[in-house]
Amino acid sequence: MARKENRDRDREERDSEFVDKLVHINRVAKVVKGGRRFGFAALVVVGDQKGRVGFGHGKAREVPEAIRKATEAAKRAMIRVPLREGRTLHHDVDGRHGAGRVVLRAAPPGTGIIAGGPMRAVFETLGVQDVVAKSLGSSNPYNMVRATFDALKNEQSPRMVAARRGKKVSEIVGRRSDAAAEAGLE
């Protein structure tokens, strides 16, 4: 009995570190002989505001149950995204899903989250404070969230790039100032 209580307490502590945002609820109807039967689908984004984020989809006959299922699915599907200075992206990225396309751009301090609807929920739960994002094509919340995640999966820190190329981080990051200096001289 004590083991089960410890497991429940550990689960509650782990869950308390996450922030979840409800992005969309969809009501669907099944027509039966006696009338309509309603069901609900929920899209939830969950994150720790420190670089981990996930999204989930849940369906049920009642809204709270659909949200609970979506939250559980989101916690199981979390990804880690490297953040620059813990507040923005390292570089600009594009993402696609279906007809939805998103463009995410790193922003200077004080910019805030400039993003529409479902993308804003992703950035708030991720812990991004400064970003500029544009959604093109589909405005379907599912496609927008999936396209945003596609873009975030392509995000790479200078450390990751340096490891892949077999170089030092200073060689990767140092090029920004070298390139700017060369451009200014010529």
UniProtKB/Swiss-Prot annotation:
UniProt name for this protein: Small ribosomal subunit protein uS5
Family note: Belongs to the universal ribosomal protein uS5 family.
Ribonucleoprotein listed as a keyword: yes
Highest taxon listed in the record's lineage: Bacteria
Molecular-function annotations in GO: rRNA binding; structural constituent of ribosome
PROSITE patterns: RIBOSOMAL_S5 (PS00585), S5_DSRBD (PS50881)
Keyword rRNA-binding attributed: yes
One GO term (biological process): translation
Function: With S4 and S12 plays an important role in translational accuracy.
Sorted UniProt keywords: Ribonucleoprotein, Ribosomal protein, RNA-binding, rRNA-binding
SUPFAM superfamilies: dsRNA-binding domain-like, Ribosomal protein S5 domain 2-like
InterPro entries found in the cross-reference section: Ribosomal_Su5_D2-typ_SF (IPR020568), Ribosomal_uS5 (IPR000851), Ribosomal_uS5_bac-type (IPR005712), Ribosomal_uS5_C (IPR005324), Ribosomal_uS5_N (IPR013810), Ribosomal_uS5_N_CS (IPR018192), Ribsml_uS5_D2-typ_fold_subgr (IPR014721)
Domain notes: The N-terminal domain interacts with the head of the 30S subunit; the C-terminal domain interacts with the body and contacts protein S4. The interaction surface between S4 and S5 is involved in control of translational fidelity.
Subunit record text: Part of the 30S ribosomal subunit. Contacts proteins S4 and S8.
Domain S5 DRBM: start-end pairs: 18-81
Primary gene name: rpsE
GO terms for cellular component: small ribosomal subunit
Pfam families xrefs: Ribosomal_S5, Ribosomal_S5_C
